[in-house]
Amino acid sequence: MSRYVFTSESVTEGHPDKICDQVSDAVLDALLAQDPSSRVACETVVNTGLCMITGEVTSKAQVDFIHLVRNVIKEIGYSGARAGGFDANSCAVLVALDQQSPDIAQGVNEADDHAGDPLDLVGAGDQGIMFGYACNETPELMPLPISLAHRLSRRLAEVRHNGTLGYLLPDGKTQVSVVYENDKPVSIDTILISTQHTAEVDGISDEQGIRERITEDLWTHVVEPATADLALKPSREATKYLVNPTGKFVVGGPQGDAGLTGRKIIVDTYGGYARHGGGAFSGKDPTKVDRSAAYAARYVAKCLVAAGLAERAEVQLSYAIGVAKPVSILVESFGTSALANDALTALVQEHFDLRPGAIIETFGLRNLPQQRGGCFYQDTAAYGHFGRNDLNAPWEDVTAKSQELKQVAAA
């Protein structure tokens, strides 16, 4: 019997790197909502009293970027008396956006391998490799460690926003360690929560007292509600439970650490449980295969698992800049499928169109911000891009396609 512990982490929307992801995706949303053909590559950096957006944009949209940035920061919770050294109302906002390189635009606008099919006209925005993954550990077909970590971080933000724990501040992280036996989760080994808080907590000012109060409050208001519907639950007796191990966490957010777009790519995906091609998502329009092809790879993997063709599936895609068709497609089932990996790969090649133009059209990626009231990608930028029931993301809707695959495999 094999036994091991696997750990994944999540961060709250107030983590400095996640502020940047949300700002970059808010810029993307605003541009696509007005002009769905916008080309966007927006990077954000934050530090004490500063937020800068930079990158390349080609769009007909007219956006007040400074107002937009301040609104995002305020929504997260950095404003007013408790904002510390990073206040939406007073921080410096710098905008340094250029146009997309004509050399890159040329390859995206007209693919090198087009042959009359309109979907062949959209070439990949860059070379690269992307991975998608799914497994049957959770109803959303995600690995349990990252699923639990996201549940905790989202609940941590929720009790801050609704005032249940009024002493909480925006910055926070969670980490969950799960025990596996024969590749199946059997128990929760450790839960770690680090959360920013006010200097005094409900009138308590000594460090030990603050830590004890937060520890009890988080178990009652975060851990228990976040895991209440799970068959595999943590317990105070059996699960190691750590809260703010350094003792206190008062200085946080961009005042404590600088943040950058794209530095939480493992949090954004599968918590390290599957491979990652290295490309970040936020701030990138759908012609960037770092984003759109990663969504497609998740869709393919989830379809295979939902169809019962594998218990675990990892899909690798690769692209060349300016070329529409993938350079390679590979499926790995880790021995959990009755079909060989090459047979699964052939099935994917036959039944999924993975050209960038087809991915954009299948999921409606250019029009999602417009259809969702001007905000879609910003919502993906915290708490993961996959396994999210709240987003109604098109790459998570596999009902029809998985049934099609099941019928094909049974024939």
From Swiss-Prot:
One of its GO terms (molecular function) is ATP binding. ATP binds at residues 15, 171-173, 248-249, 257, 263-264, 280, 284. Pathway: Amino-acid biosynthesis; S-adenosyl-L-methionine biosynthesis; S-adenosyl-L-methionine from L-methionine: step 1/1. It comes from the Bacteria. Pfam families: S-AdoMet_synt_C, S-AdoMet_synt_M, S-AdoMet_synt_N. The keyword Zinc does not apply. Binds 2 divalent ions per subunit. Its EC number is 2.5.1.6. GO terms for cellular component: cytoplasm. Keywords: ATP-binding, Cytoplasm, Magnesium, Metal-binding, Nucleotide-binding, One-carbon metabolism, Potassium, Transferase. K(+) binds at residue 43. Residues 100-110 are annotated as: Flexible loop. HAMAP family: S_AdoMet_synth1 (MF_00086). Homotetramer; dimer of dimers. Belongs to the AdoMet synthase family. This is S-adenosylmethionine synthase. It comes from Synechococcus sp. (strain CC9605). The lineage of its organism: Bacteria, Bacillati, Cyanobacteriota, Cyanophyceae, Synechococcales. The gene is metK.
